């Protein structure tokens, strides 16, 4: 364990209210390892339909090639997760505030469905550090792309997985065979039994992720990247406050523009979806703002005529940006998936 990475892990774990964390080479590495740490060929997970395009591609294609099925549930109704669950379901997965529709995920509702069954909820909290605390609402695992808000400057790629230490992995041992059956690569160790004895903490998930998946994939975070990200972490609270304030001003301005058909923001939704934003986000509703200008051509024209904003994809760094998700970050999705 590198000491610089160790400092970053402890600080992000503290930020999230978790017990332990493991840094990895990127946010996508964090996502992949979270799933591979619980699921193997023949297993499945249930994931939200509201996800980053790269994650959808990972789930639909790469994990499928490894024999892991990902079933997609519309989070508008949390019961959709239960409907897709069977004896081979190893995890539920969602994003706290998914881009571009910004419909806040029903964290407690889905976590409460999974916990009695022995199914942990994994939340990607990349878009809402500080203002959203998934572990406090029942999520078992939180992950981030450190490249975004926590790093904050667009200088370093990294990812992290935080173990909440709040999930009873022994409740249904058959549900999680990778944690509850002997691991031959470690002399037959059973993670759920061995880790608490060695560490005094309920963190078999993150320990196995570190000593098995990080070992086998070779995707650690570079110590220099960790050092740069630590610099960003020191100001993330102040930056998120300003991000949220700026976004609210942008929303107010866009709502006065006749050519803007719809303004997308967590609190601009109606009904239960808006209530979730109010319930799960405190101190602001994030920096992401979406708008509908009618057609793909209008969107391209808008982007091409920007003078101050950058046309880049890395949210949460020092630059203000604008992007058309359907032709960039979500370009590998088909029309039906884009509409979902």
Name each model-derived stretch.
Residues 1, 105-106, 147-154, 225, ...:
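Solvent-exposed, flexible loop/coil residues
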Residues 1-16:
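Aromatic- and Gly/Pro-rich amphipathic surface segment
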Residues 10, 252, 300:
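Active-site phosphate/pyrophosphate- and oxyanion-stabilizing loops and adjacent acidic/basic residues
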């Amino acid at each position: 364990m590198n000491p610089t990475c160790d400092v970053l892990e402890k600080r992000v774990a503290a930020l999230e209210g978790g017990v332990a964390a493991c840094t990895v080479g990127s946010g996508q590495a964090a996502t992949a390892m979270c799933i591979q740490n619980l699921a193997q060929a023949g297993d499945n997970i249930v994931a939200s339909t509201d996800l980053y395009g790269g994650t959808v591609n990972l789930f639909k294609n790469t994990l499928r090639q490894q024999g892991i099925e990902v079933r997609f549930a519309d989070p508008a109704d949390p019961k959709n997760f239960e409907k897709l669950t069977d004896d081979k379901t190893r995890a539920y997965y969602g994003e706290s505030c998914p881009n571009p529709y910004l419909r806040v995920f029903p964290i407690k509702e889905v976590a409460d469905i999974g916990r009695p069954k022995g199914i942990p909820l994994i939340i990607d909290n990349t878009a809402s550090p500080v203002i959203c605390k998934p572990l406090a609402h029942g999520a078992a695992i939180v992950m981030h792309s450190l490249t975004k808000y926590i790093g904050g400057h667009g200088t370093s790629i990294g990812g992290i997985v935080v173990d909440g230490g709040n999930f009873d992995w022994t409740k249904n041992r058959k549900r999680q065979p990778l944690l509850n059956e002997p691991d031959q690569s470690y002399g037959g160790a059973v993670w759920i039994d061995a880790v608490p004895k060695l560490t005094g903490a309920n963190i078999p998930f993150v320990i196995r992720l570190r000593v098995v998946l990080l070992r086998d994939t070779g995707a650690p975070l570079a110590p220099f990247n960790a050092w740069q990200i630590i610099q960003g972490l020191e100001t993330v609270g102040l930056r998120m406050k300003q991000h949220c304030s700026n976004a609210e001003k942008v929303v107010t301005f866009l709502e006065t523009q006749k050519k803007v058909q719809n303004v997308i923001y967590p609190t601009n939704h109606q009904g239960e979806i808006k209530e979730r934003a109010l319930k799960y986000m405190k101190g602001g509703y994030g920096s992401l703002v979406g708008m509908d200008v009618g057609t793909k051509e209008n969107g391209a024209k808008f982007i091409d005529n920007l003078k101050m904003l950058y046309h880049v994809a890395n949210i949460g760094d020092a630059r203000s940006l604008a992007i058309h998700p359907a032709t960039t970050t979500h370009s590998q999705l088909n029309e039906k998936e884009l509409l979902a």
